[in-house]
Swiss-Prot record:
A single BP term in Gene Ontology: formation of cytoplasmic translation initiation complex
Entry similarity comment: Belongs to the eIF-3 subunit I family.
Gene designation per UniProt: eIF3i
Protein name: Eukaryotic translation initiation factor 3 subunit I
Family annotation (HAMAP family): eIF3i
Pfam families from the UniProt entry: EIF3I
Subcellular location: Cytoplasm
Record's function text: Component of the eukaryotic translation initiation factor 3 (eIF-3) complex, which is involved in protein synthesis of a specialized repertoire of mRNAs and, together with other initiation factors, stimulates binding of mRNA and methionyl-tRNAi to the 40S ribosome. The eIF-3 complex specifically targets and initiates translation of a subset of mRNAs involved in cell proliferation.
Covalent S-S links between cysteines: none
Record InterPro entries: eIF3i, WD40/YVTN_repeat-like_dom_sf, WD40_repeat_CS, WD40_repeat_dom_sf, WD40_rpt
């Protein structure tokens, strides 16, 4: 299970994401330049140069034609995946924290930070005929977030809803057509939600939180189904597309990290059984907290991005597929 070490960023990784086929792996970091890699051998195919601040989020559409990024330079950009050119750049009033394409690829959503006297806002834009004039057009929908800022986001089924995770541990579902909240979970986490990822069929999602837990939720009712407990903040969590497995990654805040933390196993990727909530494996590798995790769409490998600036792609041994959890 020898990993691929992808070294192309000068600062810590903020998010990693596979495209639908899994042949491309996209990574964003605080060094202003998102990268795209060939996931099979770790070759860097290119960079997307244009942001002037830390890039906090990215997403690639269903056909791997467009890439959306959000950054601390108060812009969200739409890119041509193949040529690396900027299709459109949209200015915002504060940093862009999350961005996602809808399943159809017709729309994209992004949210801004609660900072500099500005409230957090959720925006939805139409990207079907996106060009440079997109920055001058009004968004399809704008929803102000009065209570707590959005820290993670996913589209619901049929592009009808958006699921948001918040800084206060709250989760909500919003109707895209009406711009109204339709389901509110209350405060499910005792601290902020760092990450949220859907299962392959979109019926469930897993959240990663600063309260040292990851939780599995029903995507329609927001009922909490399972809880995976650790001893330190969880920065990211992902659900395997082929097994009932969840992988968790995290660690202390970067400012609290010491050299002894690596030896203590604080930066391992931790595997839990989806149903039994039991940890069954750990994988070492990063020299700092893990900030983002993603399973390959075929379930035979996974990738992790860390505070150390490395992206690691781990392929599973044959024993992983042979050993059935009992």
């Amino acid at each position: 299970m020898r990993p691929l070490m992808l070294q192309g960023h000068e600062r810590s990784i903020t998010q990693i994401k596979y495209n639908r086929e899994g042949d491309l792996l996209f990574s964003s970091s605080k060094d202003q330049k998102p990268n795209v890699w060939y996931s099979l051998n770790g070759e860097r195919l290119g960079t997307y140069d244009g942001h002037q601040g830390a890039v906090w989020c990215l997403d690639v559409d269903w056909e791997s034609r467009k890439l959306i990024t959000g950054a601390g330079d108060m812009t969200t950009k739409l890119w041509d995946v193949e040529y690396g050119t900027v299709i459109a750049s949209i200015a915002t009033k504060s940093s862009v924290r999350t961005s996602n394409f809808s399943f159809s690829g017709n729309q994209a959503a992004y949210s801004t930070d609660k900072a500099m006297g500005q409230n957090c806002e959720l925006f939805i834009i139409d990207v079907r005929n996106a060009d440079s004039t997109l920055s001058e057009q009004e968004p399809t929908l704008r929803i102000p977030m009065v209570e707590s800022k959005i820290t993670s986001m996913q589209w619901g089924p049929l592009d009808e809803t958006i699921i948001t995770g918040h800084d206060n541990g709250n989760i909500a579902i919003w109707d895209v057509r009406k711009g109204q909240k339709v389901v509110d979970s209350g405060v499910d986490h005792a601290a902020g939600i760092n990450d949220m990822q859907l299962s392959k069929d979109g019926t469930m999602f897993v959240t990663a939180s600063k309260d040292n837990t990851a939780k599995l939720f029903d995507a329609e009712s927001l009922m909490c189904l399972k809880t995976y407990k650790t001893e330190r903040p969880v920065n990211s969590a992902a659900i395997s597309p082929i097994f009932d497995h969840v992988v968790l990654g995290g660690g202390q805040d970067a400012m609290e990290v010491t050299t002894t933390s690596t030896k203590a196993g604080k930066f391992d990727s931790r595997f839990f059984h989806l149903i039994y909530e039991e940890e069954f494996a750990r994988l070492k590798g990063h020299f700092g907290p893990i900030n983002s995790l993603a399973f390959h769409p075929d379930g035979k490998s996974y990738a992790s991005g860390g505070e150390d600036g490395f992206v690691r792609v781990q392929s599973f041994d044959s024993t992983y597929f042979e050993n059935i959890f009992e």
